[in-house]
């Protein structure tokens, strides 16, 4: 059955999932993304990749500066009557009023094998730290940062000569595939109390060996020429 989905995402990484949900016949009731930002030498306002794609698909778009504080936007989104929210790299922390509003929950496609690399930069940190594999998980969202139990996940190997852009392309496609795969499972659990829905779905709680992937900054890319060739290679790839 086609589900009514509220989609949250911002960068190009999230576009394949938006496309996949649309192509699968689900009804995207609206897309929520970050506001246009000034970029480039001319400081022109540039829309996010997700906004650009949503407009091409003729979907309603909301661009709250801070969804936590925008009570009007929260109410407008609630009034759309979505069955669930799908979140892929949105870029803001969602408040409880948003997380727990849809009857089938709020679900996130995350580019790592949780609990390794919770946070904003899992792709870059998996390369910087020399991980041999990473993956994608679809998890039920909680108030904590990437702390929710996992519904489904899939691993993939990281190539020695694979850079962050290339790895991100593969992970974004895998995220789209897994989210489409997850939706019938989520629907089968039906609405009701969150703990009961999660029990019916058999979600996997995250283990205790947690690592965090903070946002990469310019200093992280400074090369230390006294370091090993492998460490330098990883920084270049990330």
Regions found by a protein language model. Give the residues of each.
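One-carbon transfer enzymes
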Residues: 1-238
């Amino acid at each position: 059955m086609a589900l009514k989905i509220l989609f949250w995402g911002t960068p190009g990484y999230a576009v394949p999932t938006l496309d996949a949900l649309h192509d699968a016949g689900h009804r995207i009731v609206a897309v929520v993304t970050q506001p246009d930002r000034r970029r480039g030498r001319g400081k022109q306002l540039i829309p996010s990749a997700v906004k650009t794609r949503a407009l091409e698909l003729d979907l309603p778009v909301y661009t709250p500066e801070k969804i936590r504080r925008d009570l009007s936007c929260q109410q407008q989104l609630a009034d759309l009557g979505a069955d669930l929210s799908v979140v892929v790299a949105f870029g803001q922390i969602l408040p409880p009023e948003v997380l727990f509003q849809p009857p089938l929950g709020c679900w996130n496609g995350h580019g790592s094998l949780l609990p390794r690399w919770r946070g904003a930069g899992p792709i870059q940190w998996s390369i910087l730290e020399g991980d041999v594999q990473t993956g994608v998980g679809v998890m039920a969202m909680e108030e904590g940062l990437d702390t929710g139990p996992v519904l489904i996940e899939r691993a993939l190997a990281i190539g020695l000569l694979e850079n962050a852009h290339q790895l991100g392309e593969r992970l974004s496609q895998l995220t789209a595939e897994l989210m489409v795969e997850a939706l019938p499972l989520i629907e089968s659990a039906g609405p009701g109390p969150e703990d009961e829905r999660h029990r019916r779905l058999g979600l996997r709680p995250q283990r205790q060996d947690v690592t965090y992937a903070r946002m990469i900054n310019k200093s992280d890319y400074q090369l230390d020429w006294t370091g090993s060739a492998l460490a330098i290679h990883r920084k270049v790839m990330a």
